[in-house]
């Protein structure tokens, strides 16, 4: 709002010099934080203009949206990404869904990958938007055996269009409530890999002195009666928390036939489909992690900060190459000077003792990833997600399924 731009280097906060003090990012953040509505003055250096600018700002709450992206993939298909379930998630989701419905959306891809959960209420409210009146959403059973059954109302925003929910091994808790409600009601298809398997309701209790303890007070069950929670009574604490990693060792991450199915915990949906309890929710359409873009070329590299750091330096030193004002223009244009970009990045990796090979097999994925990182700097996370999704096998599976309808 005040005119700060991505890439500006903060030199001073009020009268406090911040540069050349070997401060960490957390040190800088702690200095920037303070009382709400308090005025501060920042002096920044902007390389593109080769000038120092001063901004008078007012501190305020930092928004942390839980709906990180929403847009129309094509004329008929919408996409919404939810990162976590917070107090504002349902409001954010409703705004996104209403916008997509106004654009005549017929199919929706709801992305819950990597979503660890959070508040239960917004998850129930979101599921309600997809289900017709009185359809079951979730069952919560307390420690004393009392069961509370939540059912849908008659006011859902998207009760009839086709629905695809993307999940993976890091989709947990409230994410699994939505996934279970959709699958058990035959409302849509789950695409991805088996979810985490956390179906416990926990209440946080203060102990004094800033300490807290979380007490388990209830369990979640899907509408058919499946327990979401992975069993933990016959395994060690370490083994329980290592279970997701163990899926790599058993082959489950590459082969859906390795997903453990408990024949004694078989449930049936209204349309006669068999679904299994025992921990986590298995997808209807499986995606191997080998099909994920990061697995195509050096998973460790993508998780490192090399590409992000290189792009920051590249955009800082050569701003004229990335002079885009319109996100649509940037989205539709190929990465500028791609051969020079690749050569410069290879050199940068060598200088950082991390030689990398970019070849015909991985070049397309690399350039798409690089373009997505640049999009964050220029336009924010929504455009970043749109670019990443162009090469996403989960998204492609959903689109292929829609085409086959």
Locate the predicted segments by residue.
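Cleft-lining beta-strand/loop regions that shape enzyme active-site pockets
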Residues: 14-17, 21, 25-210, 219
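Conserved functional hotspot residues or short segments at active or partner-binding sites
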Residues: 227-228, 232-405
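Residue-level recognition of conserved beta-strand edge/terminus positions
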Residues: 13-14, 45, 231, 278
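Short, well-ordered loop/turn sites that connect or cap secondary structure elements
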Residues: 4-5, 25, 269
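Polar, glycine-rich mid-to-C-terminal structural blocks
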Residues: 174, 186, 193, 197-265
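Short, flexible surface segments
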Residues: 6-7, 209, 224, 271, ...
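A short glycine-leucine-enriched loop at secondary-structure breakpoints
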Residues: 1-9, 33-35, 181
């Amino acid at each position: 709002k005040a005119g700060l731009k991505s890439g500006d280097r903060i030199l001073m906060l009020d009268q406090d010099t911040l540069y050349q003090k070997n401060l960490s990012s957390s040190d800088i953040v702690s200095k920037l934080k303070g009382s709400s509505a308090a005025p501060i003055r920042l002096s920044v250096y902007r390389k593109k203009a080769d000038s120092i600018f001063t901004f008078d700002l007012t501190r305020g709450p930092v928004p942390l949206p839980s709906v990180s992206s929403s847009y129309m993939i094509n004329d008929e298909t919408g996409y919404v990404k939810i990162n976590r379930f917070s107090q504002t998630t349902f409001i954010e989701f409703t705004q996104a869904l209403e916008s997509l419905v106004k654009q005549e959306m017929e199919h929706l891809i709801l992305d819950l990958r990597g979503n660890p959960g959070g508040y239960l209420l917004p998850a129930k409210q979101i599921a309600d938007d997809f289900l017709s009146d009185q359809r079951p959403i979730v069952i919560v059973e307390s420690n004393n055996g009392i069961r509370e059954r939540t059912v849908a109302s008659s006011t859902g925003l998207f009760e009839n269009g086709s629905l695809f929910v993307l999940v993976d091994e890091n989709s947990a808790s409230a994410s699994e409530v939505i996934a279970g409600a959709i699958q058990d009601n035959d409302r849509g298809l789950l695409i991805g890999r088996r979810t985490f398997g956390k179906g416990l309701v926990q209440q946080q209790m203060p102990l004094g002195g800033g300490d807290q303890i979380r007490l388990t007070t209830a369990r979640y069950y899907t509408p058919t009666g499946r327990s979401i929670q992975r069993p933990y009574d016959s395994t060690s604490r370490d083994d329980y928390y290592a279970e997701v990693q163990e899926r790599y060792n058993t082959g489950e991450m590459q082969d859906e036939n390795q997903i453990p199915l408990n024949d004694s915990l078989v449930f049936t949906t209204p349309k006669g489909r068999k679904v299994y309890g025992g921990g986590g929710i298995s997808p209807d359409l499986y995606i191997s992690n080998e099909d994920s873009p990061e697995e195509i070329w050096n998973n460790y590299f993508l998780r490192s900060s090399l590409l992000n750091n290189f792009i920051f330096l590249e955009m800082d030193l050569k701003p004229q190459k990335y002079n885009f004002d319109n996100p649509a223009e940037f989205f539709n244009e190929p990465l500028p000077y791609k051969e020079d970009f690749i050569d410069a990045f290879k050199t940068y990796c060598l200088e950082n003792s991390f030689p990398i090979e970019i070849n015909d097999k991985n070049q397309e994925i690399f350039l798409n990833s690089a373009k997505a990182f640049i999009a964050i700097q220029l336009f924010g996370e929504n455009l970043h997600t749109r670019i990443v999704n162009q090469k996403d096998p989960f998204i492609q599976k959903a689109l292929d399924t829609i085409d086959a309808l």
